[in-house]
């Protein structure tokens, strides 16, 4: 919004030539990060007090770890604050004419609404049931599908590079120009929606300990910021993406501003969500943030790399699937409890140890993901 409103003024008033800085994505990304962080820090104390006053507290599962019983009543739905602190800076600093930005923010907001309904029902009923899974999944598929289809229908209005590679998959550590996976449009769109929905639910499953989910979300957003900028960056006629032999998508660079907003809001929230947490994000936060990460993977053509980058989320999801299948087929459990972070709790690991070690793994996976751009 600021870009569209103020940048044109420099052409009419010479003394406003300094507004030229708004052209640059790195500047607007930094400003979005700072704005999101400041918003979260300023609003969080009041927001947490209001959650306490309205008795919007965490409902703990009866079959959960014993150590979680003390968490009952801790303010939840803090993800609503993350959404506000994420979406407002994105609207302020990003180029809202960019379809990728519009689609990503729409999914973030839409998944946030689904998460809000889920949290609301949990609190109202005083149990961990929430919104029935089938309704949640239908909502995610419809919103994700609409956003993905929107960008594909507009392919002719986007730079030619997007129309050319939109249904191709980049294989990590493999030169994109030589060995892309070409999918038919009717196959790719459902696959892209699956990536978005799966990432959203994976982040939701990871959000079981204080700061466990938001840490990797920040790390993933920081990595996507770099990837989006490189994919969309072009200096004169030199394209860094072409040099690295990864997909080049000029419009994707604007997603860096969105990533900056996620990082800023995430850091601000982590200040209050770190162990012992003063507030939980709830499904309103985890589903929204996961949906946003899924859209980033699709629009930067890192659908397959997201398995490595979001390895923590992937492992958490696989642990749940493995546990359910094993119990149904054999009557035995592979883990003491799923998702896997609860398994380590049951083994006696201290909560901060689990959290920090998962963060470390997430950082290492982010470094591997970035290295994949050059190691081809």
Swiss-Prot record:
UniProtKB keywords: Cell cycle, Cell division, Cell inner membrane, Cell membrane, Cell shape, Cell wall biogenesis/degradation, Magnesium, Membrane, Metal-binding, Peptidoglycan synthesis, Transferase, Transmembrane, Transmembrane helix
UniProt cofactor(s): Mg(2+)
Pathway(s) annotated for this protein in UniProt: Cell wall biogenesis; peptidoglycan biosynthesis
GO cellular-component term (any): plasma membrane
Pfam families, per the entry: Glycos_transf_4, MraY_sig1
InterPro entries: Glycosyl_transferase_4, PNAcMuramoyl-5peptid_Trfase, PNAcMuramoyl-5peptid_Trfase_CS
GO biological process, one term: peptidoglycan biosynthetic process
Compartment annotation: Cell inner membrane
Enzyme class: transferase
Entry keyword annotation includes Lipoprotein: no
Example GO molecular function: metal ion binding
Transmembrane segments: 28-48, 76-96, 100-120, 135-155, 179-199, 211-231, 252-272, 279-299, 307-327, 353-373
Top-rank taxon: Bacteria
PANTHER family cross-referenced by the UniProt entry: PHOSPHO-N-ACETYLMURAMOYL-PENTAPEPTIDE-TRANSFERASE, PHOSPHO-N-ACETYLMURAMOYL-PENTAPEPTIDE-TRANSFERASE HOMOLOG
Chain's role: Catalyzes the initial step of the lipid cycle reactions in the biosynthesis of the cell wall peptidoglycan: transfers peptidoglycan precursor phospho-MurNAc-pentapeptide from UDP-MurNAc-pentapeptide onto the lipid carrier undecaprenyl phosphate, yielding undecaprenyl-pyrophosphoryl-MurNAc-pentapeptide, known as lipid I.
Family classification: Belongs to the glycosyltransferase 4 family. MraY subfamily.
Protein name: Phospho-N-acetylmuramoyl-pentapeptide-transferase
Source organism per UniProt: Sorangium cellulosum (strain So ce56) (Polyangium cellulosum (strain So ce56))
Recorded name of the encoding gene: mraY
């Amino acid at each position: 919004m600021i870009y569209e409103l103020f940048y044109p003024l420099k052409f009419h008033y010479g003394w406003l030539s300094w507004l030229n800085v708004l052209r640059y994505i790195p500047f607007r990304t930094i400003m979005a990060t700072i704005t999101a962080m400041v918003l979260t820090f300023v609003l969080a104390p009041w927001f947490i007090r209001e959650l306490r006053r309205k008795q919007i507290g965490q409902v703990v599962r009866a079959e959960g770890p014993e150590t979680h019983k003390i968490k009952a009543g801790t303010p939840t739905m803090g993800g609503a604050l993350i959404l506000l602190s994420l979406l407002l800076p994105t609207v302020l600093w990003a180029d809202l004419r960019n379809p990728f930005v519009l689609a990503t923010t729409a999914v973030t907001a839409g998944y946030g609404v689904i998460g809000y309904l889920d949290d609301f029902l949990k609190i109202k009923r005083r149990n961990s049931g929430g919104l029935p899974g089938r309704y949640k999944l239908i909502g995610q598929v419809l919103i994700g599908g609409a956003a993905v289809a929107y960008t594909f229908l507009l392919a002719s209005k986007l730079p030619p590079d997007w129309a050319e590679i939109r249904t191709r998959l980049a294989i990590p550590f493999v030169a994109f120009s030589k060995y892309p996976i070409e999918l038919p449009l009717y196959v790719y769109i459902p696959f892209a929606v699956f990536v978005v929905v799966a990432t959203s639910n994976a982040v939701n499953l990871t959000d079981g300990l204080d700061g466990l989910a938001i840490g990797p979300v920040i790390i993933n957003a920081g990595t996507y910021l770099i990837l989006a900028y490189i994919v969309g960056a072009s200096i004169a006629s030199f394209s860094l993406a072409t040099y690295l032999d990864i997909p080049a998508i000029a419009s994707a660079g604007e997603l860096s501003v969105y990533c900056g907003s996620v990082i800023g809001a995430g850091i601000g929230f982590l200040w209050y969500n770190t162990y012992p947490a003063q507030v939980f994000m709830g499904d309103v936060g985890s589903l929204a943030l996961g949906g946003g990460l899924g859209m980033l993977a699709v629009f930067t053509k890192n659908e397959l790399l997201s398995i490595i980058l979001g390895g923590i989320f992937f492992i958490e999801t696989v642990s749940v699937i493995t546990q359910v299948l094993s119990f149904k087929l054999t009557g035995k459990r592979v883990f003491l409890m799923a998702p896997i972070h609860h398994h380590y709790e049951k083994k006696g690991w201290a909560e901060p140890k689990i959290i920090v070690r998962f963060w470390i793994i997430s950082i290492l996976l982010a470094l591997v993901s970035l290295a994949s751009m050059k190691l081809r």
